[in-house]
């Protein structure tokens, strides 16, 4: 993932965007906006219909969200992969309420 973060940084440098727009607050706002675009693909549709009609667009929006998440990590001097691994380890140690352990969709 470090290589991916480096590619994103190179892309930003090529366009002279790194110093102008690569600040955690601005990136968090942009990530939220991209996540909203991802949600728009599902608005008023079932998962099945949304995936059938908008799969390509959905995947592009997922990529945008991932790119911004990695940019935030990079702007804070953190490694994205390391952050994900640390959070997964933390989640494994957590105790989850029985309510969420079982899917609300199962009967």
Give residue spans per PLM region.
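Flexible "arm" and connector segments at domain edges
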Residues: 1-62, 66-107
């Amino acid at each position: 993932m470090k290589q991916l973060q480096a590619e994103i940084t190179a892309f930003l440098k090529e366009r002279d965007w790194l110093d102008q727009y690569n600040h955690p607050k601005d990136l968090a706002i942009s990530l939220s906006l991209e996540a909203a675009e991802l949600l728009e693909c599902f608005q008023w549709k079932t998962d099945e219909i949304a995936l059938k009609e908008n799969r390509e667009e959905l995947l592009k929006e997922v990529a945008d969200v991932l790119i911004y998440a990695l940019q935030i990590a990079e702007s804070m001097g953190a490694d994205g992969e390391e952050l994900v691994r640390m959070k997964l380890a933390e989640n494994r140690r957590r105790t989850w309420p029985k309510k969420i352990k079982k899917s609300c969709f199962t009967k």
